[in-house]
Every structure is written in C-alpha cells, then in structure tokens.
C-alpha cells in the first residue's frame, strides 16, 4: 500500500465530527460520526482515534487531512496525529489552495468546510456550470460554486435544530420533539403541528432560497444536500437534486489528492 494511505480525513464541525479512511483509489472504506467535544486534549483524541480504528478492524492512517471550524480542536487533532501516529496532517485553509478562486470580499475568511464542499461538488459539474451545496449542520450553509474551482459566495442560515432549541427555550410548555416530517401539513396535535412548522417550514425556506440563488445565476445550477439534517428533509425539498451524505468528507479527500498532485507536478 502506498505510504500516503490509508488517508484519514477529519471534518470537525460545531456539533459533530465526521471522520473517514480512504484507500489509494480515494474511496472511503470506513466512516464515523462522533460528537464534537472541545474539551478533549491531544492524548484524549489519540485514544479515541485508536479505539475507532481498532473496533472497526481498520488500519492505522499514514497520512491525514483536517478541516476544522473549531481551530483549537483542529490543532489538538494535528498534535495527536503527529505525536501518537507519526502523521503530519494537512490543515485546510484558503491560502494553502492556490488553484481555488474565492470570490468573497475577504477570501481568507472562508471556512475550511466550505472549501471541502467545493471539491466534493466537482463531480456534479459535468453537466452544469454551477452547483449549490446545501450543508445542513449547526447552521445551514448554501455554497455557490462554479466550474474551475470558483467559490462565488453563499447564504448562512440558522440550523433546524438550533431553531427548534430556541423555540423550546422561549416556550416552556411546548414539548421537545424529534425533528421528523409528519404525515400531513395540518397538525391535529401539538407534536405534529410543531413537526410541520419546523420540518416543512424549514424545507420551504430552503426551496425559496434555492430559487433565489438560481434566479441570480446566468445558467442552470445543480443543488446537492449534505450534512446530518439532510436525511430528515430528503424528498421534501423540491429544489434539491441530489442528497450526498459524504460530500464534505469526500471533498476533503479529493482536496488532499489535488494538492498532492500539484506538489508532485502531475
């Protein structure tokens, strides 16, 4: 097996951290989703990683790539990998990707996960000039991408669970519910009425924003949903074309491979 594989990809979000091992074909052979815990020290993370690999019967990584929206935790992962696995992780940032054009007022402010989505969406651009990745996480991000690795901008909205938590915190008599779609829009009890408003209402917001984005682009755009909440609204949003649960993680792997190819002059 080449020295750079297995490759460990780590996407550290505000709520969840998604990890995957990729082989030399850049296919994800193992994936995990764990809760993001900012209190974990490098040695804690090393034990956690070793436990995940061991339980899955997976090989230890020989290279790593990190995307983090929690910089202190990203640094702890990098230190844990270096100290305990002898792996120097590549940490994603706009300044490390010269082949990417970030068309923002402040290009350096782009989040690492947005760049991963750009690479993950490339396979959908064969038939389209533009793509919109809707990433359902703690926040819901709309990433607008064009061929040629151009990040055009996006939309940032409150995540569905955050909206629900805010409602429950302000209305003490409302029951905390599971965010899932009810059978019909007109609820005949409190739980179903809440589910209709929170799930169907959220889907309508997503559809409306996608229509606005498409109206501003000069050519058709493909829309792809990813992130934890994407499973809940799958089939409900009419404007989303594809659901790709591993888009960000796969984009992280392909971003790393692209950088390696540039470094080797391929």
Swiss-Prot record:
It catalyses: (R)-pantothenate + ATP = (R)-4'-phosphopantothenate + ADP + H(+). Keywords: ATP-binding, Coenzyme A biosynthesis, Cytoplasm, Kinase, Metal-binding, Nucleotide-binding, Potassium, Transferase. Substrate binds at residues 111-114, 190. Signal peptide: none annotated. It comes from the Bacteria. Its cofactor is NH4(+); K(+). It is an enzyme of class 2 (transferase). Disulfide bonds: none annotated. The keyword Metal-binding applies. The keyword Metal-binding applies. GO terms for biological process: coenzyme A biosynthetic process. Its main location: cytoplasm. One of its GO terms (cellular component) is cytoplasm. It is found in: Cytoplasm. It holds the Pfam family Pan_kinase. Homodimer. NCBIfam families: baf (TIGR00671), PRK13318.1-6 (NF009848). This is Type III pantothenate kinase. The lineage of its organism: Bacteria, Thermotogati, Deinococcota, Deinococci, Deinococcales.
């Amino acid at each position: 097996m080449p020295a750079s594989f297995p490759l460990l990809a780590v996407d550290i979000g505000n709520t969840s951290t998604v990890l995957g091992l990729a082989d030399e074909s850049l296919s994800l052979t193992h994936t995990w989703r764990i809760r993001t815990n900012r209190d974990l020290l490098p040695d804690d993370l090393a034990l956690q990683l070793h436990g995940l690999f061991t339980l899955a019967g997976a090989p230890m990584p020989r290279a790593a790539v990190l995307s983090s929206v929690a910089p202190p935790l990203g640094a702890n992962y990098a230190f844990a990998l270096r100290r305990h696995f002898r792996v120097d992780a590549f940490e994603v940032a706009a300044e490390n990707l010269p082949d990417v054009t970030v068309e923002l007022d402040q290009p350096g402010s782009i989040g690492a996960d947005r760049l991963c989505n750009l690479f993950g969406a490339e396979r959908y651009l064969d038939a389209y000039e533009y793509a919109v990745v809707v990433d359902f996480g703690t926040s819901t991000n709309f990433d607008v991408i064009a061929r040629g690795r151009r990040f055009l901008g996006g939309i940032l909205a409150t995540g569905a669970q955050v909206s629900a938590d805010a409602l429950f915190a302000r209305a003490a008599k409302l029951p905390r519910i599971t965010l899932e779609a009810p059978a019909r829009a007109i609820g005949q009890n409190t739980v179903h009425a809440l589910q209709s408003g929170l799930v169907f209402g959220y889907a309508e917001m997503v559809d409306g924003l996608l229509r606005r984005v498409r109206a501003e682009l000069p050519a058709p755009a493909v829309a792809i949903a990813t992130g934890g909440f994407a499973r809940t609204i799958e089939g409900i949003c009419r404007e989303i074309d594809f659901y790709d649960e591993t888009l960000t993680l796969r984009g992280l792997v392909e971003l790393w491979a692209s950088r390696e190819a540039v470094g080797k002059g391929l």
